[in-house]
Amino acid sequence: MNYLIRDATIVNENKIFQSDVLIKDGRIEKIVTHINLKYSIKEIDATGLYLFPGAIDDQVHFREPGLTHKATIYTESKAAVAGGVTSFMEMPNTQPPAFTQQLLEDKYNIAKHTSLANYSFFMGTSNDNYDEVMRCNEKRKDICGIKIFMGSSTGNLLVDNPLALDKIFSNSELLIATHCEDEKIIKENFAKLKAEKGVLEPSDHPVIRNEEACFESSFRAVQYAKKYGSRLHILHISTEKELQLFTNIIPLKEKKITAEVCVHHLHFTSDDYERLGNLIKCNPAIKSPNNKAALWNALLDDRLDVIATDHAPHTWKEKNEPYEKAHAGLPLVQHSLMLMLHYYKEGKITLEKIAEKMSHAVATCFEIEDRGFIREGYYADLVLVDLHKPVTVNKENILYKCGWSPLENFTFPASVTHSFINGNLIYENGVFDESYKGMRLKFSR
């Protein structure tokens, strides 16, 4: 169906302006102050609403295949769409992990039939699947990137063989995304704390997975990338010390090394373990208020390039085990845009910066074709937001399959009212049209 969005306040490419938007055959046909048509069309009255490019989340864990008691591509993509996330890139630590081209394509096939949002999937790496990883080079336009766990996390896909890392960094033609935490430091910290305390608790998590563990691993990844001229993207930066590894003196398009920050590291601090315990246990750990403040500064001055969620759902039971057994990760994809709009209302970030870090910059970093901007000719991945319609997170409106959120009872000052994906109105004021499915993302490489 074609649509005419009337009188929207558009937030795009560092500008805010009033305009109509004509959507035709899945793409943005026209952006003009007032559009007069000689034929009938479905109109959306956007008076008083803000139109954003759909958010693109470059790091989610949707748990399919193999872990579908936690989540599925269908359930989590539905939650994403309700929150204004119109495209996602999913990580390889499913069961089995995406270690072969066939296993990777199996995930694409699931998404083709079930995902309400647009999608791409990272190829997984291990110490011994180099040949399969290199086959991604010929598919560079069809795969978002290669994921390397340089520290162990959920799924234990740790790559710790220097020869394997050397070969991948030297020969991959795709973006390499890394989870950076130093395994040796983590194990030493754990053993020391365990010997001292006996029983560990959630507040010990940032002591075990500390600043030094993050910095040493990120530093090592940067050294590999500089040695071989690799395209490196370090995920979920969580410490002030790591920020020295990144620059803001060149345009994003020219950067070979980029960095992501996640909404939970911008929102929570180590002070919140007392209240939320294992619910905010994640890797890398949520750390001190000083680290949070440094991350905000780096985001706003462009040393940190994109905002993501690292959406990682687990069941309530899995999160409420004793600390050592409790699973790491938290569900966030439904609430990331609204959380950033909360910080807009708090005066922390502008609307233009939100659009940049959650849409424009992600599209630029990954060279995504025809998405991430409100431009004529681009796919109509668009989100309407009511900045004056508060919503409180509760069990009734949480769409994650796991059924909980660390933000439960938090009231956002704004709501997502409409989500268009490929020109289709998939979400409107709590109602979904599931007759349309998302598309596989393509990349201009």
Which residues fall in each region the model found?
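N-terminal metal-binding scaffold of metallo-dependent hydrolase/deaminase domains
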Residues: M1-K38
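Histidine/acidic residue-rich metal-binding segments in metalloenzymes
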Residues: D131-I307
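His/Asp/Glu-enriched, well-ordered alpha-helical/loop segment
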Residues: L200-R220, Y224-G229, L279, L300-I307, ...
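A glycine-rich helix N-cap at a beta->alpha junction
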Residues: N109-T125
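Divalent metal-coordination and catalytic microenvironments
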Residues: A8, V21, G26, G48, ...
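Metal-associated gating/positioning segment near the N- to mid-region
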Residues: T47-T114
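Active-site metal-binding motif and surrounding structural segment of the metallo-beta-lactamase
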Residues: I35-L51
